[in-house]
């Protein structure tokens, strides 16, 4: 079992993933586990500290989430955040009740006592609150470390036990020194060293792959995106002669994608590539399917079938490698009390029975860590910084049924969007950019004639790890040129709209 410096117990907060991400940025390996993980599993991880995340429940409610009480007797430093703070207070017999004044948004705190958390930090700070309950009295043995206008017990702790509790969320960017607070907890309370990096990760994963695979062969599924490219490079660094890299044209790719992928692997990466045209089978199975979850599961099942057929042609193939990321695992609701957002074609969308064992060497890291790993493995910046492209491809960028005419419309619009972003220098400034073909038509006027054609939506977002995202503030003239070109050059589209929603509440992809 992989060891972790700090374990984050997930009580259902939308920010739980950010806690782990912020710690990893400091070189500390943090791992997220369900709130009800067993004490034995916690001990097996040999952590140096534990963090209790926030969550939507109330500790006094009948449906409250509780972890094993034994964690408070392990002798490990513990940091409670929001719900985790209230859980700690509740455990030590303090009263937690509904707050008369709920706090959502920015607040100012003032540090009242020096502690490991606030070492070398200002006395006054801006933080991010998101709570509707409050701690009414201080737990016995604890003392106040910081206050806010509405929270006299905003931060409290027991320095001897190294237990700390925060009413605010240090993991979000709005908390001015939140990242420093988490770093201080790891460094001064838990005695963690900053040794986690992609160099050490690559070495560990290569050893793990060799140990798990032995002399067997591995089919590596690639799409041309950064995730699968990094997986292929990592496998090649560990067991090059045992890796069979397979690219499947599922008919759901962007314009020119197949040719780009084949060139990249054979010429840029120096990796032999088997290319399979399975577009007919994918598109036939997607016919008349409109539900996005069904699309994902059909695509996931069909991918596996295609790979299993290819595996039969090669002796000793026992494994299938995929570029599943930590964000995929999280959004498919594998950990904690979080709700399922959507199944990913390479997680929840997979069939229950597989004749190949699955190997996912990136499933413990975030997108920006994948990019860093790619550079560590020698991949070019051109490959590493390509915009993310989903496994289900254009199928989840077409609202409703997927068919060849719709795919052709979407491809043409997408080419124009990317051309304009690259020519204006905006492509490299953004996290992801694509078009969505909406399942609606609208009235227009072109050349004095009435039109009734398709609408397309432009989605361009800024992000660092894909867990949260904001829409990109593209200049109006750039948007205008994109819209004008799509409407003039793509027959069948007469309206272009821009998606200005952020994640959360929206996801980056529409389906």
Swiss-Prot record:
Pathway: Purine metabolism; GMP biosynthesis; GMP from XMP (L-Gln route): step 1/1. It comes from the Bacteria. GO terms for cellular component: cytosol. Residues 196-386 form the GMPS ATP-PPase domain. GO terms for molecular function: ATP binding; GMP synthase activity. Residues 5-195 form the Glutamine amidotransferase type-1 domain. The keyword DNA repair does not apply. InterPro entries: Class_I_gatase-like, GATASE, GMP_synth_C, GMP_synth_GATase, GMP_synthase, GMPS_ATP_PPase_dom, NAD/GMP_synthase, Rossmann-like_a/b/a_fold. ATP binds at residues 223-229. Its EC number is 6.3.5.2. It catalyses: XMP + L-glutamine + ATP + H2O = GMP + L-glutamate + AMP + diphosphate + 2 H(+). Keywords: ATP-binding, Glutamine amidotransferase, GMP biosynthesis, Ligase, Nucleotide-binding, Purine biosynthesis. The active site is at residues 82, 169, 171. Catalyzes the synthesis of GMP from XMP. Homodimer. This is GMP synthase [glutamine-hydrolyzing]. The lineage of its organism: Bacteria, Pseudomonadati, Campylobacterota, Epsilonproteobacteria, Campylobacterales.
């Amino acid at each position: 079992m992989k060891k972790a410096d700090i374990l984050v117990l997930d009580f259902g907060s939308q920010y739980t993933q950010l806690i782990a991400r912020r710690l990893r940025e400091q070189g500390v390996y943090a791992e997220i586990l369900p709130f009800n993980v067993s004490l034995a599993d916690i001990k097996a991880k040999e952590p140096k500290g534990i963090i209790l995340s926030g969550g939507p429940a109330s500790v006094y409610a009948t449906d409250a989430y509780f972890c094993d009480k034994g964690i408070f007797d392990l002798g490990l430093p513990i940091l409670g955040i929001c719900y985790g703070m209230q859980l700690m207070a509740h455990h030590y017999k303090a009263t937690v009740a509904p707050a008369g004044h709920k706090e959502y948004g920015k607040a100012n705190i003032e540090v009242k006592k020096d502690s490991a958390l606030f070492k070398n930090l200002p006395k006054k700070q801006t933080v991010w609150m998101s709570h509707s309950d409050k701690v009414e009295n201080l737990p016995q043995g604890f003392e106040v470390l910081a206050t806010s206008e509405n929270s006299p017990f905003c931060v409290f702790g027991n320095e001897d036990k190294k237990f700390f509790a925060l009413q605010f969320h240090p993991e979000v960017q709005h908390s001015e020194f939140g990242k420093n607070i988490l770093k201080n907890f790891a460094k001064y309370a838990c005695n963690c060293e900053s040794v986690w990096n992609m160099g050490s990760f690559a070495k560990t994963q290569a050893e793990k792959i060799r140990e798990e695979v032995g002399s067997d062969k591995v089919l590596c599924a690639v799409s041309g995106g950064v995730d699968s490219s990094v997986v292929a490079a990592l496998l090649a660094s560990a067991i090059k002669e045992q890796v069979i890299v397979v690219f499947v044209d599922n008919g759901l790719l962007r314009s020119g994608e197949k040719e780009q992928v084949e060139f990249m692997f054979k010429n840029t990466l120096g990796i032999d590539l088997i290319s399979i045209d399975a577009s007919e089978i994918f598109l036939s199975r997607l016919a008349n399917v409109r539900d996005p979850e069904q699309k994902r599961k059909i695509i996931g099942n069909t991918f596996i079938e295609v790979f299993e057929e290819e595996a039969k042609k090669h002796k000793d193939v026992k494994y299938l490698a995929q570029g599943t990321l930590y964000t995929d695992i999280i959004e498919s609701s594998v950990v904690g009390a979080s709700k399922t957002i959507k199944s990913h074609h390479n997680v929840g969308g997979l069939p229950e029975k597989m004749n190949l064992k699955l190997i996912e060497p990136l499933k413990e890291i975030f997108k920006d860590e994948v990019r860093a790993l790619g550079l560590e493995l020698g991949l070019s910046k051109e490959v590493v910084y390509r915009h993310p492209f989903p496994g289900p491809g254009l199928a989840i960028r077409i609202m409703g049924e997927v068919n060849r005419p719709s795919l052709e419309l979407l491809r043409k619009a997408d080419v124009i969007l990317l051309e304009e972003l690259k020519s204006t220098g905006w492509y490299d400034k953004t996290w992801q950019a694509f078009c969505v073909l909406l399942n609606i038509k609208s009235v227009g006027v072109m050349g004095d004639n009435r039109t009734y054609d398709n609408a397309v939506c432009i989605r361009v977002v800024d992000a660092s790890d894909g867990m949260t995202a904001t829409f990109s503030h593209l200049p109006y003239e750039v948007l205008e040129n994109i819209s004008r070109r799509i409407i003039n050059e793509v027959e069948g589209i007469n309206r272009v709209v821009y998606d200005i929603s952020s994640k959360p509440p929206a996801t980056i992809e529409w389906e």
